[in-house]
Structures are given as structure tokens and as C-alpha cells.
Amino acid sequence: MSEQYFDPKLKIFALNSNKPLAEKIADAVGVKLGKTSVDRFSDGEIRINIEESIRGDQVYIIQSTSAPVNDNLMELLIMIDALRRASAKTINVVIPYYGYARQDRKARSREPITAKLVANMLETAGATRILALDLHAAQIQGFFDIPLDHLMGAPLLADYFLNHHLDENAVVVSPDHGGVTRARKLAEFLKAPIAIIDKRRPRANVAEVMNIIGDVKGKRAIMIDDMIDTAGTITLGAQALVDAGATEVYASCTHPVLSGPAIERIEKSPIKKLVVTDSIELPAAKRIDKIEQVSVGQLMGQAIKFIHENKPVSPLFKNRFHNEEN
């Protein structure tokens, strides 16, 4: 554990979605995780008990709303309510992976905006601040009427490629037009050019690669996205890059959702290595040799300390992507 933190009024609790990451975050802060129990009634209802006093404390709850999304979201809402009723001074919700983020707008008639609904529920339950990591859509920050600090996983992914000298003769590739800003920032850090894969998606979770904008021939292609779900986009893109003359293909993302046929597709693809963070806990079956995880524990732990001490989080991104105080 890091040096013990001096303020006894800072408490960190973890729910069930990603306890290994929660331990790393608490260790980075220098505190032990608070005592709480999460059980189920016989009919499946969630029961939470906070096993220590938090009256007047500044509390941080760590919970990714990853699969099973609805269970993890409900756990979080119930925990927030319990903390509010137990007189916590502040309730800071740390969400390494924000579920329902892809439903951030009405793409068709009569569709909900579920990302906004989740924001409403978190606020209504009693959250006073959100600490999020690589939200799928930037506008989700505006769905909240409480403070939200938004961290980025890209600097950690960039560190991996730099430390392994993979930035040499590299081109950073966005798998679609929507990810160009993310790719450009990574490219600036790696001092590499960018390329874009132009694709069409005929239906949900199915992607068709059309063409590549930019020069990838004879280069090491590094693809970056915020999340990989069924891996259709990333694997089709990798094959398109090889067909266009890339010497090798690496892929990276912050959130390894990896549902359905994702692992099989990655195994069969020309991707040499997929670099992801631990925002979502990977079960043993998904920890294949091609996947490398880097931890966001230190990053999020430092953010918690800065927030608790009323300091800007911008030093976490010094000389990288964020240069202004937040």
C-alpha cells in the first residue's frame, strides 16, 4: 500500500463489479477499502449493509456498470441511497466503465436516451460528484447537473506503446470517423501520422469496412477505440489494414467489454496484441495471450486524492492530452 493517507474522513467502498481494480485504487490513495456487504434476498433483490460509520465522511464508491449491467447499476444506486441515509457528507461515484453510454442520443424515432436516464438516477439517488473514465460520448458530461471529472485512458495506452518501442514507424488508426479526435491525440503523443477506417454498419454489432483514408503501407498500425464489444469493427479493420500493406497491427481500447464472439474473433484476427485497461474485470476465459492489460488504478487513485484536496486533476495529464485546469 502507498503511504497511509492522513484524512480519516476519506472513505472508499467497493461493490462487486471490479474489486481487483478497487483494491488498486485504494492502495494508490493509501487507505483500506471500507467494510460493506452485498447480499441477495431469495427472490434476487439486492441487500446492502454498510458495516462502519460514515457520518460526516467524504465517501467514494467504486463500481463499473459493466455486465451484468443492470445488477451492477442497481447495486450502485442502492449503495448511494444507503450512504445518503447514513449521513455521508459527500457521495463521490467512481465509474471506471459507464454502462448504457452508447445510448447517448436518439438515433431513430421513439428511442430512449438511456445514458441520460442513468445520470438522472444517480443524481436522484444522492450522488454529489462523478469520476468517470473515457466516456463513450463527450456529451454525457453534460447529462449531469453535479460536478463530473473525466479521466482518459489513452495516456496509459500511449505509455505501453512507448515503453515497448512500438511508436517507431507507426501510424495511429481510428476504426471510424467518430474516433478521429481520440486517434489524433494518441498520434500527437506518439509523434505518428493518423489514418481512418471508413466503415458502414448495416445493423447493431455488425460492421463492414469500406476503405482506409491515409497511408498505412509498410507501417505498424496502432488502432485505438474507447471500447471493444463484439470485436467486429476492430478485427475487420485489422484485416483491412493488412490488406492495405500494414506490416503489423496492434489494437488498443480503454474498456474491454469483449462480449459474444469477441475473443474468438481476436484470436483469429491479424492483431498482434490488444492493449486494454482494467476498467472492466476480465474473467480467466478472456485473458488470452493476445490481450495485455494496463491498470488505471494509480490514475484513478491520484484523481481521488486531488479531488479530496480540492486540487485540479489536470496534472494527471501533464504534457499529454489535457493542458487546462479542470
From Swiss-Prot:
It holds the Pfam family Pribosyl_synth. Mg(2+) 1 binds at residue 136. One of its GO terms (cellular component) is ribose phosphate diphosphokinase complex. GO terms for biological process: 5-phosphoribose 1-diphosphate biosynthetic process; purine nucleotide biosynthetic process; ribonucleoside monophosphate biosynthetic process. Its EC number is 2.7.6.1. Transmembrane segments: none annotated. Its main location: cytoplasm. SMART domains: Pribosyltran_N (SM01400). GO terms for molecular function: ATP binding; kinase activity; magnesium ion binding; ribose phosphate diphosphokinase activity. The keyword Cytoplasm applies. The keyword Cell inner membrane does not apply. Keywords: ATP-binding, Cytoplasm, Kinase, Magnesium, Metal-binding, Nucleotide biosynthesis, Nucleotide-binding, Transferase. Homohexamer. This is Ribose-phosphate pyrophosphokinase 1. It comes from Lactiplantibacillus plantarum (strain ATCC BAA-793 / NCIMB 8826 / WCFS1). The lineage of its organism: Bacteria, Bacillati, Bacillota, Bacilli, Lactobacillales.
